[in-house]
Regions:
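Aromatic- and acidic-residue-enriched segments that line the glycan-binding/catalytic groove
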Residues: 18, 38-54, 112-126, 153-189, ...
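Short, solvent-exposed turn/loop segments enriched in Gly/Ser/Thr/Pro and often Arg
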Residues: 30-33, 101-111, 151-159, 233-239, ...
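Loop/helix patches that line or flank the sugar-binding groove of alpha-linked glycan CAZymes
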Residues: 20-23, 31, 36-74, 78, ...
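The substrate-binding groove and active-site-proximal loops of carbohydrate-active enzymes
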Residues: 68-84, 116-130, 195-210, 227-237, ...
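Active-site-proximal helices and loops of the catalytic beta/alpha 8
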Residues: 137-146, 155, 160-171, 217, ...
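Active-site-adjacent "subsite" loops/lids of carbohydrate-active enzymes
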Residues: 161-225, 235-236
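Hydrophobic faces of well-ordered beta-strands that scaffold small-molecule active sites
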Residues: 25-27, 101-103, 147-149, 230, ...
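N-terminal structural segment of carbohydrate-active enzymes
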Residues: 1-146, 161, 487, 496, ...
Length: 509
């Protein structure tokens, strides 16, 4: 790596420092399942049959199709969480060093997942009201947390009042909001041909006015309520042009707002439409590596291609996801704890905004929907729980290392390891990350390709810095020889010169 033009580098890092979206830790909450409501029994009237209330110790399972409701039974099983119970648990987000609270959909809808909107401008009563949301946002902001909502703007639920009127009255002005006709199997077009999810005709001006263009639109009005951004469901279905229009509307309404899209593709090119995407490309790469399907050398090349193609600024705002409400839990896909620790650590150390799905931090297990939406295991949030204890240390360390949230990335050539640097405008903030997925220790000599790293510089394990046996390596003439234990990962930071000691960095930034 050539010495960067220092002023340009400083300016780029300073811009990232000022942008809360770059490298933020995002904690995702499925509201019904995150924390039990204090008034659980008083809420029974909100769940009329065929909806069912479940107890917190129960786990969701695939159900049967309920003909009268037009949905599956597991879609209308409820555990009773709400916005007030989320407020009561904001301290947990602080403990994991989260920067952002992201809520799965909360607008009025029939199901527990709320991806079938019945009214965008109203909160589902099981969860609360717009006033409850404003109180949650206020409490979150007081703790330094941003709040992002899930926007489902490609389709609605069949119980949406506009859709019901459109189907009932051929002359309804809302008829043009949907794709209605005999050429469709159900008499209308549904997302993925699901009858419960009629597609919106977003080409219509009046539809976009209702969703994001108009002053009282969903996107704008919730931003005025204090939220800080939107995660867009099935964003690719909206198309780049309308995504750009929506993103611009959000930025116009609130400077610095975030619009991140659910895109199951490579991230390259989406920066022209969105602030970031859910980086499922990164997820596949990390799962392949931590499951032993590809080696460190191949993984390094895949990650470098991803960053080079999309650009580091965009990647820093993309959400680094290992699991969410649409995927099996990480503990199911990577059952080995040592391998899972590597996945967690790389999610935290690679460029991007780590997206932690509630319960990931305690190793919650579960297959695909609905198993991946189990109630939060609060009994596992304790100091002697190995995974929780490690995740707290990991994210406390991440917050203390500016390079991991705001820095550039430089992948190092290695035959068997995954190795990379995270760098900022301050050389002594450089971080070296080493991962070994093999069952044996690996020793290699790596070229440390940053010319600012002076001969004699030591790097030491940041998570175990004060332990006498903490891993430490030395750089000489741009090389370092490392031995990484089997199935392990290390985040190493520069050992700074002691006060009064000669420093080769005395005239280096």
């Amino acid at each position: 790596m050539l010495l960067p033009h220092l002023n340009d580098f400083r300016d780029r890092i300073a811009a990232r420092d000022a942008d809360w979206r770059a490298g933020a830790v995002v904690y995702q909450v499925f509201v019904d399942r995150f924390a039990p409501a204090e008034n659980f029994h008083a809420k029974t009237s909100l769940y009329p049959a065929p909806k069912r209330m479940r107890h917190w110790h129960e786990t969701p399972a695939k159900g049967h199709f309920v003909e009268s409701a037009g949905v599956w039974s597991h879609e209308i099983d409820f555990w009773g969480g709400d916005l007030q119970s989320v407020r009561a648990k904001l301290g947990h987000l602080e403990a994991i060093r989260a920067d952002v609270l992201y809520l799965n959909p909360i607008h009025l809808a029939y199901t527990n997942h709320k991806y079938d909107s019945a009214d965008y401008l109203e909160i589902s009563p099981e969860y609360g009201t717009r006033a409850d949301l404003r109180m949650l946002v206020g409490d979150a902001h007081a703790r330094g947390l941003k709040v992002v909502l899930d926007g489902v703007f490609n389709h609605v639920g069949k119980r949406h009042r506009f859709f019901e009127e459109a189907m009932r009255d051929p002359h309804s002005p809302y008829r043009s909001w949907f794709f209605i006709g005999s050429e469709y199997p159900n008499g209308y077009r549904g997302w993925a041909d699901v009858p419960n999810l009629p597609d919106l005709h977003v080409e219509r001006d009046e539809v976009r006015d209702h969703l994001w263009r108009g002053p009282e639109s969903a996107v704008r009005s919730y931003l005025r309520d204090g939220i800080d951004g939107w995660r867009l469901d099935v964003a690719s279905d909206l198309g780049p042009h309308f995504l750009r229009e929506l993103t611009e509307a959000a930025h116009e309404e609130k400077q610095g707002a975030l619009v991140v899209g659910e895109i199951w593709n490579a991230p390259a090119g989406w920066d022209r439409a969105l602030d970031g995407i859910l980086n499922m490309n990164l997820r596949m790469t990390l799962l392949d590596y931590c499951s032993g399907r590809v080696d460190g050398h191949t993984t390094s090349h895949r990650l470098k291609d991803m960053v080079d193609d999309a650009g580091i600024e965009f990647i820093l705002r993309c959400w680094s996801t290992l699991e969410n409400h649409d995927t099996p839990r990480l503990a199911r896909l990577v059952p080995d704890l040592a391998a899972r620790r590597i996945a967690h650590t790389l999610q935290a150390a690679l460029p991007g905004a780590p997206n932690l799905y509630y319960g990931q931090e305690v190793g919650t297990d579960g297959d695909a929907d609905p198993e991946n939406r189990a109630p939060m295991r609060w009994d596992l949030v304790r100091d002697d729980h190995e995974e929780w204890s490690y995740m707290r240390r990991l994210y406390s360390t991440r917050r203390s290392l500016r390079a991991l949230s705001k820095g550039d990335v430089l992948f190092l050539s290695s035959r068997r390891l995954l190795a990379f640097l995270r760098t900022t405008d301050r050389t002594l903030e450089t971080v070296l990350v080493l991962a070994n997925m093999e069952d044996v220790a690996v020793t290699e000599t790596l070229s440390v390709r940053d010319g600012r790293i002076m001969a004699g510089t030591d790097f030491r394990d940041a998570l175990d810095y004060d332990r006498p046996d903490a891993m430490q390596v030395n750089v000489q003439m741009g090389f370092t020889t490392v031995t990484v234990p089997p199935k392990s990962v290390r985040i190493l930071k520069v050992v700074p010169p002691r006060p009064g000691q000669h420093s080769p960095y005395k005239r280096m930034a």
